[in-house]
Amino acid sequence: MMVLDKEDGVPMLSVQPKGKQKGCAGCNRKIKDRYLLKALDKYWHEDCLKCACCDCRLGEVGSTLYTKANLILCRRDYLRLFGTTGNCAACSKLIPAFEMVMRARDNVYHLDCFACQLCNQRFCVGDKFFLKNNMILCQVDYEEGHLNGTFESQVQ
């Protein structure tokens, strides 16, 4: 398997020369394995170079890794957290590319703007939310809207 670091095109997976053990940037132990990863000008055990969000092994996932805000990320989590520079779907203000965001389908939100648009309830990790007629709703407001027929009259 050949894994390339997108930034400099240098193979991340290397064969370690005998007798010269490198120190792992992840766990600070000597790398005794035959194979090691080199990324961000540091050496890593294959098990130690992981995405800070999903914990996937970056040597297995694909050819690139991403780093931002002192985080090492896989492509999926980098795009999920930082996306591209654009506007918040709730407040329409600019979202800088370095800022963490929330996503719901194609919409991107500031963390502070990701709340029920009827009652302003903020969501915590794991909370259920609904996207109806391009509005973020908590479960209570979503169910009330269905019961009283509000959403049927707002079909877009």
UniProtKB/Swiss-Prot annotation:
SMART domains: LIM (SM00132). The keyword Protease does not apply. Keywords: LIM domain, Metal-binding, Nucleus, Repeat, Zinc. The keyword Transport does not apply. This is Rhombotin-1. It is found in: Nucleus. Expressed in the brain and not in the thymus. PROSITE patterns: LIM_DOMAIN_1, LIM_DOMAIN_2. GO terms for molecular function: metal ion binding. GO terms for biological process: negative regulation of transcription by RNA polymerase II; positive regulation of transcription by RNA polymerase II; regulation of T cell homeostatic proliferation. It comes from Mus musculus (Mouse). Gene3D superfamilies: Cysteine Rich Protein (2.10.110.10). The lineage of its organism: Eukaryota, Metazoa, Chordata, Craniata, Vertebrata. Its main location: nucleus. Residues 22-84, 86-148 form the LIM zinc-binding domain. SUPFAM superfamilies: Glucocorticoid receptor-like (DNA-binding domain). May be involved in gene regulation within neural lineage cells potentially by direct DNA binding or by binding to other transcription factors. GO terms for cellular component: nucleus. PANTHER family: LD11652P (PTHR45787), RHOMBOTIN-1 (PTHR45787:SF2). The gene is Lmo1.
